[in-house]
């Protein structure tokens, strides 16, 4: 039997994702200052500026949105996941820096025109928390993590999750 390497499966999954339209970026190539943070700030801010160009969002306003997502607690898992799901499906209301402007309802994903979203696959994305985690492949939409792949060998009985 030929040896099986998880890295080969990881490469195959990434190739399939690229064929499906996902942009691939190795984690080492991402600008990240804080390894505890899982958002891709540049992708999120670029989406907001592009999608809501008519609102002329200020850097302070996009920072508020990013902070709202970044400060959702990871534990308890169900509560945090529910809060993120609500933001992704319902959007959020942004109070504008200029009080003369009305509040704006923003959606973090463009369901009407999916091609307006940024789909990014990242491998070996290191995250520091109570312990270090390095998922094999992480999928982001507009800089927001939405899917984790942890690829394991089906033939190695010693593998751990």
Place the predicted regions along the sequence by residue:
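An alpha-helical interface "stripe"
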Residues: 1-161
